[in-house]
């Protein structure tokens, strides 16, 4: 009988090589290094396969029909009952969970940043790392557990994304506030989003990297992070770097909320309105335990364990109750703020906060639990709402006109929780308001064209004298402004409006004659075709010409739909954030951009919602179509420009070509004949990425194969159509 094997505990196994005094520790799989640990500068292609179907436990992905079947009235009744059903394991402050849910919703939606459209509450990221463990989200793990009975009961009729955001909205209604409405329709993702750059700091509440080189200028916060400290949704409530300077705090507030696409009125409304409810928690000096992501198994996903509960709860370390009625909507936040002079004090946990001078209002404020009394307190950032000249002018008016505060808060709150949802065509449910706002990027519903109309218009475009390059480029420029992060941009006819008309990437001088010709065709047609449809249809005509020239007969799909947005329906300042800093698909690099072009390409592909194969085939096709910015020959690896061939990949993978940096040292490369040394091609960093990166080269080789010529055309058409329809949420209905 063989001797039974013995094994050391997991993580402690060792191998002793023969005649070696240097044991090699074998790590368990969870501790193994990744490719990115070895090669941290490699492009991250994982972000091009976000939330893949393989990890989605639902049968067919997000079920909008199930959401539409939700009995909203019954659901609201159940939710309202939950609000005041205090649980011993996490008692409700003042007998009402409403303020906790407002904070949860606010902190979910408030991660949005307008710079790249990432963040927000639209994909249910708050339960996942890193957000679930941010210091600013202490105790929100409990808020989500309180909601579990509702989620369990209603299942796929309401996503976690919707439930988390809805909770704050309905809670405020239950506490007497009239909201502007609510839209369901947020899908759940099943893994953390790893394409969001939150900052470079390696410690919670760090700020040194995001202000590197700022020399004390708080407006020079690194982009795109929107908050001054790692792990904060907004600003440090104690003041910048913990310094209780409310005027300096106002600078941070304006910068941070501006990056959330909020103006001064919206910012003031959100702070004043939000702080009408509830309290902060810092009643003792006990320390929180570890965050949820690092907590021991037996805590079952909850974190920050400590003995404090009820009146002894500790979260932020600040102990502030703003009003006498923390579960009721009124104007008392401003009334208290302006009726007292304030002096600096410390919370029991040692945090900087403010109380009325001369011990005013002592023993007149409710405690979270029981009948005890305390005094009002304010955060440093609350005082910014009074003493900053701009915020002060706004809030002083609201002090005397509370109805205006209510109106502005309703609008700002609705914007906060819907900003990342995209167009109103994605809004579901009976609570959607009829009113629309400029920030929603409204595009009027369009007319469905008949097959005869489409054929007539295609013929007119084909006979217009516009080249394949002009047609393809214009369609790409219009559609490629789309970003899947907040579902903004895309077509809609805005390519001829400011600011897009003036973007460097769109080559205004080259664009003008194309716009004029398409408008001429539109005016001559009695079909009612929109300019937006003509732009896409022009791309179809150009592609089909290029496909035919390559010897194939492949139709390019087209579905008519959207009408044209008007200039007055376009927020120029907000749309300016959609301007690409680089577009590797057309070999465009913005002047002065310090980010390598290949990183910009991956980011652009990610924002377009493309997979790595789709990105690859589009690059190869656009190069041979001559679609480069400025007519550049970089990466145009064909002598048959305008034909949709796989020449790009054939020549890119040709070992008869030797590549070297161009003599000008301008980030471009020259390909020479390996035998003769004669120059053959020029290319960009983006182009060589598809020959040098192991994964992308594998894809390039597929399209370079002799039997892939037709596959290449069909795959290009499919990827092209995906980009053209990226903003067509009406097609998903």
From Swiss-Prot:
EC number of the protein: 1.11.1.21
UniProt key word Iron: yes
Annotated catalysed reactions: H2O2 + AH2 = A + 2 H2O; 2 H2O2 = O2 + 2 H2O
Keyword annotations from UniProtKB, A to Z: Heme, Hydrogen peroxide, Iron, Metal-binding, Oxidoreductase, Peroxidase
Record note on modification: Formation of the three residue Trp-Tyr-Met cross-link is important for the catalase, but not the peroxidase activity of the enzyme.
Biological-process GO terms, alphabetical: cellular response to hydrogen peroxide; hydrogen peroxide catabolic process
Positions of heme binding: 275
PROSITE patterns: PEROXIDASE_1 (PS00435), PEROXIDASE_2 (PS00436)
Placement of covalent cross-link Tryptophyl-tyrosyl-methioninium (Trp-Tyr) (with M-260): 106-234
Oxidoreductase recorded as keyword: yes
Pfam families: peroxidase (PF00141)
Cofactor(s) listed in the protein's UniProt record: heme b
Similarity remark: Belongs to the peroxidase family. Peroxidase/catalase subfamily.
Subunit structure: Homodimer or homotetramer.
Role noted for this protein: Bifunctional enzyme with both catalase and broad-spectrum peroxidase activity. May play a role in the intracellular survival of mycobacteria.
UniProt name for this protein: Catalase-peroxidase 2
